[in-house]
Every structure is written in C-alpha cells, then in structure tokens.
C-alpha cells in the first residue's frame, strides 16, 4: 500500500527484503544505507529480537523521480528469518509494494531457501496478497563463497518458469546490492505508475508510514 502525504507532496512505496535467516537481508540494507548520501536517505531504525533483526529506513534515491506530481520515497524493510518470528514477518508484509527474496547460495541452504519462499507465498495469501501479482525479484547472495549452488540450480528451485528477474550478489562486499535495488525499484515504480493512471479517485491520505512492531 502506497502512503501519500499531500502536505509535502510525497508518497512512499514499501519494499520488503525476505529470505531465510542469515541469508544477507540485513547486510543488503546496511550497504545501501552506508553508501547512500545522508541527504538521500532517512535514519535507519533497528528493531532487534534475541537472535535476529528487523530493519527499517526511508530511502529517497536521486533517480526515482516524480510520479503524478509526488516525490517518491522507498521504504526498505527486512523481516526476521527465524521460523518463530513468523507473526512479525506477516505484519511487515502488510501493505508491501515490492519484494526482494534473498537466497543464500550455499549448497546446504537449498532446502531453507525453498521453505522460506513457500513461507512467503503462504504469508502473502493469509493477508490477501498473491505473490504472482506483486513486483518480485530474486537475489542469489554469497556468490563469493565456496560450495555454492549454481545459478541454474537456484533457478530450478525458486524460479522454474524463469519469469522472475534475478541478481547474483555478494552483499558482504557490496557486489550486486544496488543492482538488486534498482531492479525491484524499477518494477515497483512501473506498477505504481500503472495503478495511478488507472485510478479515477483520489487515494486515501496517510500522514506518515508507521514502523512495524517486532
């Protein structure tokens, strides 16, 4: 759900980084935050759990542009990867506009990747969303490590029909992080433009987006 602020003529689209525990979701956001000029991003807020983290911050890339007269801001979230935080994951997914699924390329992580992707589909269905109708890209992370799955193996497991864009990455050193962000931003903004051009009535006004509870 896109949030509109008519006072500042800004709107915010929500992008969620999803995937199994320790796959690199948090690392992606730290790299983006650290390499983006302070004038082009908001403050990063970390809602920590005992074994994992959920992160959130506003981001205003220079090249997002203006849509329908609104300056567009992207809100980037991660979700906790541990199974017992599934309720939190569903809360974070509410109102999502685009998803980056971060897969861990290490060979022993094949089944956890598949299970996490199934979990994504199930959680979206529970909140009335269809994964096939949302902008979604895959990031195959940790390509710099040994004993990793091939891209073909990852696609066979997560992208068998080849319909999803995917990006190879090594988030720990920044490789592929911004390419992934650019990919999901492009799809999300394209969907947003299409949605706005098809709506005849004025959208609901929200003063500001709320940070999800852990």
Question: Whereabouts are the PLM-identified features?
Answer:
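Conserved beta-strand/loop subsegment of P-loop NTPase cores
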Residues: 98-101, 125-142, 160-168
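Inter-motif core of Ras-like GTPase G domains
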Residues: 85-108
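Amphipathic helical hotspot of TIR/SEFIR-family domains
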Residues: 108-130
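Conserved nucleotide-binding/hydrolysis micro-motifs of P-loop NTPases
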Residues: 22, 82-83, 106-108, 142-146, ...
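Canonical P-loop GTPase G-domain recognition
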Residues: 137, 144-197
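Conserved G1/Walker A P-loop phosphate-binding module
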Residues: 2-49
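Switch I (G2) and immediately adjacent beta-strands of P-loop GTPase domains
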Residues: 44-84
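Low-complexity, Pro/Ser/Thr/Gly/Ala-rich intrinsically disordered linkers and tails that serve as
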Residues: 202-214
């Amino acid at each position: 759900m896109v949030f509109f602020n008519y006072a500042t003529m800004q709107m915010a689209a929500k992008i969620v980084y999803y995937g199994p525990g320790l796959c690199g979701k948090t690392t992606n956001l730290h790299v983006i935050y650290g390499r983006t000029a302070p004038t082009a991003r908001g403050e990063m807020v970390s809602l920590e759990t005992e074994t994992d983290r959920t992160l959130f911050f506003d981001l205003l890339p220079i090249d997002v542009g203006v849509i329908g007269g609104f300056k567009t801001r992207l809100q980037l979230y991660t979700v906790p990867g541990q199974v017992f935080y599934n309720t939190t994951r569903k809360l974070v997914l509410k109102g999502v506009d685009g998803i980056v699924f971060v897969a861990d390329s290490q060979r022993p992580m094949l089944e956890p990747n598949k299970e996490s992707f199934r979990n994504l589909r199930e959680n979206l269905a529970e909140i009335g969303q269809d994964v096939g109708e949302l902008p979604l890209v895959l990031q195959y992370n940790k390509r710099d490590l040994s004993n990793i799955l091939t891209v073909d193996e990852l696609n066979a497991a997560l992208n068998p029909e080849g319909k999803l864009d995917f990006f190879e990455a090594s988030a720990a050193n920044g490789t592929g992080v911004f390419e992934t962000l650019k990919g999901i931003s492009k799809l999300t903004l394209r969907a947003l433009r299409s949605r706005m051009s098809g709506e005849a009535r004025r959208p609901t006004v929200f003063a500001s987006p709320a940070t999800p509870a852990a």
